[in-house]
């Protein structure tokens, strides 16, 4: 059931999306930062999806709210991703690691790659050896969506990411 506060916004969004002549429809979310309104956000995306049938949902990162210690960060990040994954009816969900999606200590470099492991089974996704960056091909539209990372544990961007992107 749609939150009544957002009924007007949802109706306007449906109308706007349906009036566009584009073929690719993406539900785009960013900076949820463990917000208490995240369930309502997912509910609203789902309500719009029922009418427009999004091709996927993309979350541009910052699921968390800054550095959180170790395993607690992993638990919170998995909860947030699990909350957003079913936002669109076809289940296609592509998260990006934001600069606040980190944690402290040795666990940090494993956190994001482990959490997005579900992408390895997603059709059309190419993710090099457990890296936080990847791309997905949307075959029906002949589109490649490239997702880079604004927080890379081993190094800040640099040569490996550039080499990978040139080989795509």
Protein language model regions, located:
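N-terminal active-site segment of His-dependent metallophosphoesterases
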Residues: 1-74
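Extended active-site neighborhood of metal-dependent phosphoesterases/phosphodiesterases
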Residues: 5-13, 70-168
